[in-house]
């Protein structure tokens, strides 16, 4: 994997009254999509604010490429509610030497917004798409997106993910994508970092992480004491049990145990539950 990181967080911590983030190490190499996943309140937005310089960390260091090469898509646009779409190019364009008006106009058509539409009139999907339009119009190399698909209908969500996939056809580009909708990561992410209550519980190449674990299920007679001790996030029900186990421990499973490849959601749910049960 390339050492050409467009963003790198090292040893990041942030202490609030009732919440602590970190220590967090996270890198987004050129040409890769990093998915930052966790439940609401896990610390994803705090991590992104620290990455962008909007919040200072308690400890640690942040490396970020020049901010003129970074495109940001937040939960809600941070522009004045009374601005019209056409005002965005007039007011924001001069800050970027690479601003491309033609690209902006084409992307506004893709977003389905009139140049006269005001920011306060945006639907959630429009707000996300117009932020993407601004980011791509100024030639961003790194897109940082905070929960971009949350609350979108399936059509708008698919259109946004298609545009991000198109963006990633250029090997110079990278994406940091925070979400609690793990199916988005199944489609897009090369790398995954999973947060739970401010702590990293798994991080690495997505496919490697999925291969390192297995979802197992079986009947009550199959759950030996040794196997129980190795299972993360054990769930027991009337039909038997299920949980997550390291692939290296599959030899502990008897013939009645069924093993499957986990999803990112399985890792999030069962590793987080395993921490709480410990």
Short names for language-model regions:
Residues 42, 154-156:
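Helix N-cap at the start of a conserved alpha-helix in ABC-type nucleotide-binding domains
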Residues 143-147, 152:
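Catalytic Walker B motif of ABC-type/P-loop ATPase nucleotide-binding domains
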């Amino acid at each position: 994997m390339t050492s050409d990181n467009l963003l790198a967080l090292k040893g990041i911590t942030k202490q609030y009254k009732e919440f602590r983030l970190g220590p967090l190490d996270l890198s987004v190499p050129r040409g890769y999509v990093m998915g930052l996943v966790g439940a609401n309140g896990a610390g994803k937005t705090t991590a992104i604010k620290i990455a962008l310089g909007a919040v200072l960390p308690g400890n640690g260091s942040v490396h970020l490429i020049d901010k003129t090469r970074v495109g940001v898509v937040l939960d809600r646009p941070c522009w004045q509610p009374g601005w019209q779409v056409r005002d965005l190019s007039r007011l924001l364009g001069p800050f970027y030497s690479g601003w491309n008006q033609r690209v902006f106009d084409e992307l506004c058509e893709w977003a389905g917004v009139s140049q006269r539409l005001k920011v306060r009139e945006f639907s959630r999907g429009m707000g996300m798409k117009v932020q993407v339009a601004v980011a791509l119009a100024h030639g961003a190399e790194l897109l940082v997106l905070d929960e971009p698909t949350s609350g979108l209908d399936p059509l708008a969500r698919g259109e946004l993910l298609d545009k991000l996939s198109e963006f990633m056809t250029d090997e110079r580009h990278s994406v940091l994508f925070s979400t609690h909708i793990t199916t988005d990561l199944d489609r897009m992410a090369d790398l995954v970092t999973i947060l739970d209550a401010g702590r990293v519980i798994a991080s690495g190449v997505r496919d490697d992480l999925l291969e390192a674990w297995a979802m197992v299920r079986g009947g009550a007679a199959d759950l030996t004491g040794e196997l129980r001790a190795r299972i993360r996030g054990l769930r027991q029900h009337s039909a038997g049990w299920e949980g997550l186990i390291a692939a290296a421990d599959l030899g502990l499973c008897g013939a009645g145990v069924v093993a499957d490849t986990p999803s990112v959601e399985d890792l999030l749910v069962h590793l987080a539950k395993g921490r709480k049960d410990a």
